[in-house]
Each structure stands twice: as C-alpha cells, then as structure tokens.
C-alpha cells in the first residue's frame, strides 16, 4: 500500500536528506501533535525523525535498537548511535543488542526484547509469496541460486574495489545463477565500469 504521507526527499547527501526529513517531519508534528515517535532500524529517516521529535519534547521508541557494527564509516552506524543516544524506549532484536544498550548505561526498564520483526513479518507472510516472473525463465531451483545485494557506499563507490569484488563473486559462484537486484547507487557505479 501507498504511505499516508510521503516526504518525497529523494536522494542527496546524508546532510541534505537529514535536513529535508527534519523540516518535513517537524511541520507534520506541529500540525498533528503526537504522544510518541516510533522509528525503525538504522536509516537516515529514523535518526532525523528521532532528533526532531526530541526537540519537540516527544518521546522516541526505537525498534531494532542496540545493533552495532563498530564501523563508523557506515552511515547506518552513525544513525544507530545517534538514534539510540536520544531514545526513551528501546525495542531490541537480540540479546547482543540488549547487552550493547546495557553497556551504554541504558536501564533494563527501558529495554524491551521483541525479536527480529523483519523475520517475523516475513514468516507471517510466507503463504502470500510466489515465485518471481523470472523463476521459470531461468529454471531456478530452491537452494540452487544466490541473491546478491550490493549498495553500501563502502562496497560500491570505489570502482576498482567494486570491480575486484564482482570478479571474485563471479569466480566463486560459477555453478550457481546469481540474482542481482541492482540498487540505483550500484547502477551508477556499474555504468562507470562499462565506460
């Protein structure tokens, strides 16, 4: 279904996206007061909405709180750290995430283990899933193909490293078909490889 509200921020730098989301979300909250801001995951919109809500004295609940990679070069890691630093209620997906929050001095009365909501959603909808249109065309068999996603800046922005990664994947997966839904960021790098 289509969202009720779409800020239509689009792409841009991390700062541009964050600023645009905050401006739109602040206007929305001022026109439609809320008792709670619920954010999910480690995307820029979660961080931007959490900051905006807290500035308006609206408590924040974070689903997938406490997840850490330790890689500060990832925008998602910055988003996680900032969001969790201003969250009131933490909904965690694992004991590791809960422990990460405890180490950051978050008290147990603010941490709620809920499990992996993405996997729960997938499992609840399994009967609705059907093979994609290309399933028969490529004669795919369950467990006999690989799905590849590449979109993180650290994986796709450096052309030489990206090319080396693709060649390595190609060598390692020769006997299995690779399904590669291409992210716009990745498509841009792929087009530069061709040229």
Task: Report the location of each language-model feature.
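Donor-nucleotide binding loops and adjacent catalytic segments primarily
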Residues: 1, 130-195
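Short, hinge-like loop/turn segments at secondary-structure boundaries
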Residues: 1, 55-57, 77-81, 108-109, ...
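Active-site and donor-binding regions of nucleotide-sugar-utilizing enzymes
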Residues: 5-105
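A nucleotide-sugar donor-handling region in carbohydrate enzymes
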Residues: 9, 86-160
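Generic structural signal for well-ordered alpha-helical scaffold segments
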Residues: 26-30, 123, 135, 170
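Phosphate- and divalent-cation-binding pockets in alpha/beta enzyme and binding domains
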Residues: 47-48, 100, 121, 188-190
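Residues at the starts of beta-strands that form the adenosine-phosphate
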Residues: 59, 110, 177-178
């Amino acid at each position: 279904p289509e969202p009720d509200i779409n800020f239509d921020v689009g792409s841009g730098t991390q700062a541009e996206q964050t600023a645009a989301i905050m401006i739109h979300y602040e206007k929305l909250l001022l026109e439609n007061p809320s008792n709670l801001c619920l954010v999910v995951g480690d995307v820029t919109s979660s961080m931007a909405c959490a900051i905006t809500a807290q500035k308006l004295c609206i408590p924040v609940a974070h689903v997938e709180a406490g997840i850490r990679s330790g890689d500060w070069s990832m925008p998602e890691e910055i988003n996680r750290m900032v969001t969790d630093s201003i969250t009131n209620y933490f909904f965690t997906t694992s004991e590791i995430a809960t422990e990460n929050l405890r180490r950051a001095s978050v008290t147990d009365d603010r941490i709620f283990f809920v499990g992996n909501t993405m996997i729960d959603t997938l499992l609840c909808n399994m009967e609705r899933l059907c093979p994609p249109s290309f399933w028969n065309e490529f004669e795919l068999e369950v467990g006999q193909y690989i799905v590849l996603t590449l979109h993180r800046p650290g994986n796709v922005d450096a052309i030489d490293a990206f090319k080396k990664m693709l060649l390595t994947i190609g060598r390692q997966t020769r006997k299995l078909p690779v399904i590669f839904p291409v992210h716009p960021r990745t498509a841009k790098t792929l087009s530069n490889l061709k040229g």
